[in-house]
Structure formats: structure tokens, C-alpha cells
Amino acid sequence: MEGPEIQFSEAVIDNGRFGKRVIRFETGRLAKQAAGAAMVYIDEDTALLSATTAGKHPREGFDFFPLTVDVEERMYAAGRIPGSFFRREGRPSTEAILACRLMDRPLRPAFVKGLRNEVQIVVTVLAINPDELYDVVAINASSMSTQLSGLPFSGPIGGVRVALVADENGSQWVAFPKHSQLENSVFNMVVAGRVAGDDVAIMMVEAEATDNSWNLIKEQGATAPTEEVVSEGLEAAKPFIKALCDAQADLAARAAKPTVEFPVFLDYQDDVYAAVEAAAADKLAAVFQIADKQERDTASDALKDEVTSSLAGQFEGREKELSAAFRSVTKHVVRQRILKDQIRIDGRGLTDIRQLTAEVEVLPRVHGSAIFERGETQIMGVTTLNMLKMEQQIDSLSPVTRKRYMHNYNFPPYSTGETGRVGSPKRREIGHGALAERALVPVLPSREEFPYAIRQVSEALGSNGSTSMGSVCASTLSMLNAGVPLKAAVAGIAMGLVSDQVDGQTRYAALTDILGAEDAFGDMDFKVAGTSEFVTAIQLDTKLDGIPASVLAAALKQAREARLHILEVINSAIDTPDELSEFAPRVIAVKIPVDKIGEVIGPKGKMINQIQEDTGADISIEDDGTVYIGATNGPSADAARSAINAIANPQVPEIGERYLGTVVKTTTFGAFVSLTPGKDGLLHISELRKLANGKRVDNVDDVVSVGQKVQVEITKIDDRGKLSLSPVVAEEEGAEGAERAHATEPAEGAEI
């Protein structure tokens, strides 16, 4: 965009052999009536407009900062018309809601404390390269427009996504990766922070292992995202954050409005705090040694009523200040006990985990279910399986158009013993569900290995600290109970941080498995999920201006010890996938030639509809010729497969058919036998006993050899079309005849 009124600055992000990215900040041309507005470009083909405005007067009766952050995804940005009935954008997509949360979390702590004027930040996606991720650009755009607005905001705040991308020269942390680059990365994380002296203080982290990370690590030898590697990624993000902050500061120095004096409403005055502290501090220390949450809350509420009543006459009309001061004194008492005595609210040490309970198959008829309990936090996980055509269709600016694994998180008000609204999910519930989903996606089987759409629901039945990480554990249990062949079990833990001045020094204490109160009174909520080998998801929020990376690195190591302990509990409840529930649909895959798709469908769908009607199966066909067959039972699915093969694959073997095959390979567990060109089956070592007069076979080569002809019968075809074989011995052949054999030579002449 051009014009004499435009002022700009640029941040050049150098990724070495992966090239450079240019982030350009502009102001002065668009949205001139907003308090602050900025256009932000990445490489000139993705553009976002951020506008920050503030209410003229403080909101009456508000005891919190009313900040609203919104993202408007315009489909014209990608050259598309919305797919809704009215062909117009409606409610925000899940991606937009998650982007709002990414922006809100680092920005909110940067506003002056006590601000009660409404502040709204709106980021509109005006143009986007389909290969770009706009969410991290939006963090910088919202920070830039807020800096320009004249609001009491201690920015700038820079945000960057870094991905551990592998190529022939090794792995490197790449800033602002594209969607296509993420396919070759094992881990990516969004890191937001601010410049603090000569360093960068980290304010927010959102990280995940990628969908393809397991294959890249196990099959291609890529670097696994261990705690040490993740810590290196946090350090790698710092120079990029500094470059972004410097560019914002440069433009703000030239174009920002003078900071406006807004009325600030402190929660209490010093005289109120001193009176409450004198009346309540010693008693609070005793109250917060009660381990049970409900007993502790009851005692705390009673003490609060006692203190406010006794001081009401002294501070008439200042009841709200008394209540706020009581909370602040409570916070100070709890934090000082942790830092000085290394003892927490419920009497645990800093690294102690509450009692854990894991149980599977807790509901009848559902496909998979489990309950995971950590102290008073109780999560029920429920898994539902269906055909792939039931996967979620996505209409957003992302190139991802469908999602096979859907994770929904519900947080009813009774989970904390309260009343409240029940209905559509709020942003918090959407965010928690997305976090649990990201933690589990890396260990899910591929579509080919497990051709099912998977819906996982986490019900928070009781809450006292980290229901999102409890959801990860419950989901692992539930999916294994449903028969989902996870590549590894995943567990999650929430870490906390308390920092304060003790004897003139700043001390940090990292807490394992935080309570709800420790989350409220602490400085950090740091959630880490992963397998026994590596990290799969991270979420960090802080109330401080930033946290040293060294403190986060230590917390990561502490979280790993807790995660391994939780995984032991999960494995003791269930360590391998169960059989599919009798109530779950049976989904099998058949591969047919692409030029046969029309024949299977038939004119106006006549053939496929007839097969579905005759067998009771549900059939869907992919463009590559993969046919997915779903049915309520195995015989229906097998009947549909036979009908499809009769049309498209007339030479495809079926159960019970006999072949004179040729041994093409021997292994320690059996021999592979070629039945027809391109179609092999496994003759397991346990079946070879029939060829050795019933004797145990220890060495396959002692019974059969490559090139030998063997008469076999197909005994099983699994969901992926793999064939299991059994040898046909002379007695069976003589008794039953060879009328079903598909041999090119008479069965009697076969040399075994």
C-alpha cells in the first residue's frame, strides 16, 4: 500500500538456508478513526489489519479489565466464497477463536493494572497466501496497533512460530514456517515475549508435535522433541522476538499517540490491606493447611466473613476493598509458605503428585470410556468411532479442509460445585479441547492403519487443577479401551510457578500438579503433555512480565518426571488396545482400480445403492480408489467387500478359497506365499506344524523354502486386506476335493 501518510518499519527474519521472511508494519492509511491501527504484511502476500479502540468511560460495576480480542476471517482473503447457506461469514471458526486466545494471553498482562475502560482489538485477515499461518502474525499486529493507540500498554510484544524442520543437512528451528514446511517438521511452537534488558522474557508458549512427527522420528531418524530440544527452541525464538519488538518500537516512536491518562481503579488502598493482614494473616496460615478443597474453602469463606464484619465499621462503604484485600493477603500467605517452607496448600512438597486413579470401560454400550482422577480433578473420556465420511468438514482460511480426530471438552458448572450457564462451548472450552487434541494427534494411527473417524469427548466432572491435562490422560485410556491402536500412551501434567522476594532475593519455586488455588495465586500455568519419549504439546501462560527461559527449562524436566509416573498408572489400567466394541461399526478398506469407480457406483448410483441395501453396509469411495465399508457387524462388511470385489477386483481372493502358491520370502515368524501376481499371504509359523506332522517348528526354513509350491487356503482377511493362510494337507484335499482351488496345476500334483 502506498501514500505519503504511510509510515512503516520492517523486521527481517533470517532462517539461514531456509531463506528470509520480511514482516512489515504500516500505519496511517487505513482505519484512521480507531485509536490505533496497523497493517502487517508477511512477504507482501499476506496482509492483516489490526485496530485497537477504547471506551471513553470506565465500565460501572466491573472489578476486572474488560478486554475483548476478535479475529475476522474474510474468505475473500483466500479468493473464496463462504460455503454457508447465505454465502457470508458467520460465527468465527475454531481457528479464529484459537487465534484470539493466542493474542489475548500475552497482551492482557501488559495493560496497566486497574484499567476498567473497555478495550477491543479486532484483527481482520484481508489477504492470505494459502500456505501461510496468520495467527502468529496477528499477535504482532495486535501489539502494534495497541502501541499506536495511546493506551497504557507496556509493549511491544513479539510473537513467532518456530518449527524444527528437517532436511538433508539436519534439523533447524525455522521462524514463520509455512504449512508445507510443517510437513517435514517434528515440532512447532508459538512463542510470545518482550525485550527485558539484554534478554527476552517469555510470556506465552503454545506448542505441539506435528501430525507426522512419529513417522519422521521413528522411520527417518529426525530429532525427537525432548525437553532439552524444546528448551533449545525457546532460546532459538528469542532473536526473532527481539527483531519483531525492535521493529514495532521503531514505528511506535515515530507514529504512536501520546499515552492517555485513563482512570485506574485499584482493588484496595494500603490502609485496608494493613488492617486485613493484621486481622487475618495468622488465621489464614492455619486455614491453608487444610488438605480437602471443600473444607478449606468453607473455612476460608467463614474467616473472610469474620474479618470483613469486624472491619466493616472502620471502613464503611469500602466492602469491596476489604474483599479484594483479603484475597491479596491470602495470596501472600500461600506464596510465602511455599517459598520459605517448601510446603504447599494441601501439605504436599513442590514435586509431589496427588493420588491418581485410572479406570476403563466405565459406561455401557459406548465404544470406549474411561475415568481419570488426580486428587479432586475427575475427567471422564468417551470415544466414538464411525466411518471416515463422518469426519469434520472445515470451511476456513486454512488449507486443512477435513479433520478425522475431533476432541470436544465440556466444563459444566457443577464441576466446581457452582451454578452457571449450560450450552454452547465458550472460548475456554474450545481452547482446552484443542490443547488435548494436539497432545494426542501425533500418536494416532494413520487413516490407512485405522480407517475410522474418531470423536473424543472429555467431561470435566470435578475440577481442582488442570482438567485439560486430565483430559489427555482420560482420552488415552478411553481410546485404548475403544480399540484405537495408539502408537504410544500420552499423559499430561500442569506445572505452576511462584516467585517473590524472600530476604531481599527473588526466588522461584516450580510446582508439580497444581491445584486450582495454586493456579489462581501463582504466576504461571505451564501444561506439558507427551509420551515416555518426547513432548507432544505445551501451553504456557504467565501473569508476570516474562519468565526466564532457564526457569522454564527446569520446569520442563520436573514435568517429565511427573509424566512418567502418570504413564505408569495409565499402563497399569490398560497397556494395549482392547478389541473393538460390539456396538462399534466395522470399517474395512478395499482398493479398486480408479477406472472401476464408475462401475461400482453404477448409473445414478444404482449399483452402490443396491449393495448397501442388500448388505446393510455403508460405503464411501475416495478419489484414489480406496473404498471404505462400514457396517454394524463383520458379516455385513464382508458381504459388501465381496460384492465390490466381484465388480472391480474379480481376481481378489476371498476367505475359504484355495491356491497353489509359491513361497517368495521366509521370516522368523512365517513364510510369505504368492497366490496371484501382486497378491501375497502370510503362512504363519504356527500353521507350518501341519506340514511337519504336527511337530513344533522352530525354523521356517526347515519346512519350506523360497520357490517351493504350497497348497494353501485363505483363513482370514484383516481390515487392511492382509491375507492369513493355512496349508492344505493331503488328507484334507482327499476328503474335500479341489473344486474351490484356483491352482494352475492339479492340487494332487503339488509337491509339499
Curated annotation (Swiss-Prot):
CDD domains: KH-I_PNPase (cd02393), RNase_PH_PNPase_2 (cd11364)
Positions of the KH domain: 585-644
SUPFAM superfamilies: Eukaryotic type KH-domain (KH-domain type I), Nucleic acid-binding proteins, Polynucleotide phosphorylase/guanosine pentaphosphate synthase (PNPase/GPSI), domain 3, Ribonuclease PH domain 2-like, Ribosomal protein S5 domain 2-like
UniProt cofactor(s): Mg(2+)
InterPro entries registered for this protein in UniProt: ExoRNase_PH_dom1, ExoRNase_PH_dom2_sf, GPSI/PNP, KH_dom, KH_dom_type_1, KH_dom_type_1_sf, NA-bd_OB-fold, PNPase
GO terms for MF: 3'-5'-RNA exonuclease activity; magnesium ion binding; polyribonucleotide nucleotidyltransferase activity; RNA binding
Catalytic activity as recorded in UniProt: RNA(n+1) + phosphate = RNA(n) + a ribonucleoside 5'-diphosphate
Keywords: Cytoplasm, Magnesium, Metal-binding, Nucleotidyltransferase, RNA-binding, Transferase
Gene Ontology CC terms, in alphabetical order: cytosol
Binding site for Mg(2+): 519, 525
Pfam family, one: PNPase
Disulfide bonds: none
Predominant localisation class: cytoplasm
Ranges for region Disordered: 727-752
Any single GO BP term: RNA processing
E.C. code: 2.7.7.8
SMART domains (UniProt xref): KH, S1
Residue intervals of the S1 motif domain: 656-728
Alphabetical list of Gene3D superfamilies matching this protein: GHMP Kinase, N-terminal domain, K Homology domain, type 1, Nucleic acid-binding proteins
Compartments (UniProt record): Cytoplasm
Function: Involved in mRNA degradation. Catalyzes the phosphorolysis of single-stranded polyribonucleotides processively in the 3'- to 5'-direction.
Family, similarity comment: Belongs to the polyribonucleotide nucleotidyltransferase family.
Protein name: Polyribonucleotide nucleotidyltransferase
Organism name: Pseudarthrobacter chlorophenolicus (strain ATCC 700700 / DSM 12829 / CIP 107037 / JCM 12360 / KCTC 9906 / NCIMB 13794 / A6) (Arthrobacter chlorophenolicus)
